């Protein structure tokens, strides 16, 4: 009897792969070269990926058999740390060192963004270390909404202040009245 055995399509297996990106590649997005089963191909990593994220590349896993679909390739993302910048959601966070005078009086402070371009933060008068100032839309670029570039204020003083600076600091404390006592009560 001429019985035919029906051959069922089998989908290909999914594969896993790891990729390490620079911080800038993770923030800006990047086209990367990959290989799977000896085949090389390029794919685009979207802007704003974070460390530990998984990206699915449909059809880039093991080939299907008998007309089955190819499996998927799952890319596990590792992002190298940057010495200056960090990512919080779509916002790029950077330190913003300023002087005591700039913190007290407020100031326009120039810094360099992730691309090395000069940008200006407006630090309001009375800012303390840890305060955050933003430049809207200068974070991770996203089709829906861009993140912000955030400067985290760090008030810095000279490591070896001279006598004039030490005297000025004492005069500043006197001029602030009860502020030092208020701080002492917070500790």
Named regions from a protein language model:
Residues 36-187:
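Intrinsically disordered, low-complexity linker/assembly segments
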């Amino acid at each position: 009897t001429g019985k035919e055995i029906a051959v069922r399509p089998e989908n290909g297996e999914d594969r896993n792969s790891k990729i390490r990106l620079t911080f800038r590649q993770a923030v800006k997005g990047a086209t990367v070269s990959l290989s799977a089963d000896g085949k090389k191909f390029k794919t685009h990593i979207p802007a704003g990926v974070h460390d530990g994220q998984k990206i699915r590349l449909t059809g880039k896993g093991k080939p299907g058999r008998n007309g089955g679909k190819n499996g998927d390739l799952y890319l596990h993302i590792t992002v190298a740390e940057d010495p200056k910048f960090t990512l919080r959601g779509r916002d790029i966070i950077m330190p913003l060192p300023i002087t005591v005078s700039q913190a007290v009086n407020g100031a326009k402070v120039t810094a360099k963004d992730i691309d090395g371009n000069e940008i200006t933060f407006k630090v309001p008068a009375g800012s303390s270390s840890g305060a955050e100032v933003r430049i809207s839309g200068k974070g991770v670029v996203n089709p829906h909404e861009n993140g912000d570039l955030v400067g985290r204020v760090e008030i810095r003083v000279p490591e070896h202040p001279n006598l004039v600076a030490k005297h000025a600091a004492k005069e500043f404390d006197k001029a602030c009245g009860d502020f030092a006592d208020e701080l002492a009560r917070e500790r």
